[in-house]
Amino acid sequence: DWTDLTMDVAPYQTSKTKAEQYLWDFMKEHEGKTDMEAVAINPSMVFGNSLSDDIGASNLVVKRLIDGSLPFTLNICINIVHIKDVADMHFEAMINDKAPGKRFIASNNHMFFPEIAKVLNDNGFKAPKRKLPTFLARILGIFDKQISFFLRDIDILRIYDAKNAKDILG
């Protein structure tokens, strides 16, 4: 399924969706004119080591959970994948004859932010122990743009189906 761009979607998701749609339009337009193949790998929230000082947006969320800049969590579910698994998928997609022309979701698990905070606390970090109640988040969202952006995702279980990727790419 495609991200519904008629909804209130973050610029990041919009750019990713449009880029992939352009890829498939390009491939269709050049079908039979080139031997080029395409595969789309759509990772969920990517965590893991960074090769540079830029830790990336996903790792920044964890950093903010443990550095005290987030005093509470919101009950938001995210799907997660390790950077090494994403790299392995890219490699496998290049050498697997069943991959061309397909779209794959890279996701290993899903967790709500309070669960993530608990895992961090259980491993010696000082993540928030409080979850902001939904009613209070909705009130604060009127004044805080960051909280407002996440309101549509509070208390919603989202599980990305990566079965296709696991079946074909391993």
Task: Place the predicted regions along the sequence by residue.
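Mid/C-terminal beta-alpha module of Rossmann-like enzyme folds, strongest
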Residues: 89-148, 167
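Conserved sequence/active-site signature of Rossmann-fold short-chain dehydrogenase/reductase
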Residues: 46-48, 86
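Active-site loop of classical SDR/Rossmann-like NAD(P)-dependent oxidoreductases
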Residues: 113, 149-162
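A conserved pocket-lining segment of Rossmann-fold NAD(P)-dependent short-chain dehydrogenase/reductase
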Residues: 3-8, 52-53, 59-81
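Active-site Tyr-X1-5-Lys
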Residues: 5-38
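Substrate-positioning beta->alpha
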Residues: 57, 72-94, 102
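Glycine/proline-rich active-site loop of Rossmann-fold NAD(P)-dependent oxidoreductases
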Residues: 32-35, 48-61, 93-103
